Amino acid sequence: RLICDFVLGGNCSRGVDANSKRTSNYSPTGFLNKKFINPDLTKSKTGADYTNTPWPLIRLAELYLGYAECLVETNHLDEACTYLNKVRTRAGLPGVKEAWEQFGKEPAKATTKEGLRDIVRNERMNEFYLENQNFWDMRRWLLAEKYFNVKVKGLNIDAENINDFGEVQEVVFERKFQSPMNYLMPIPSADINR
């Protein structure tokens, strides 16, 4: 599912000298994302091109993976694998049990409730990358403080060659998630005063 091109410079760097140093409009992690970017559009000489693109409110994969998650929690593991496989097949991947038996470090992981729960969560993270689902999933699973309090890491955007670019660096910005406070959302006053 993941295809990468590595390019030095461009929007992945802060710039090379005092005249070109950037304080914004660059990727601090070195990763630029192309999901949902129309490949026919490129930046023109006179400005940026744009197009209106429909955005799905809910995708079939979300229904399948949500249902698979429910099936795992109610101990219907074989049926959960069926719905996981519908998403994996569309992406050109082998079935979940087959993949774990052949390529996984834990071949029996897809046969246990805890293992399949982890697999469903990982599938959701991969499938809904950049679709703002992970934030809500982590809160729903009560895992946000575990994952949202770690330091962000990225590539070495100041590198001058491709080997140094691949070195993992800590990115200088802090994330804080406080439990239980950040698991809760305020109720708007307009709703309270109805």
Which residues make up each language-model segment?
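Acidic/polar-rich alpha-helix caps and helix-coil junctions
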Residues: L2-R194
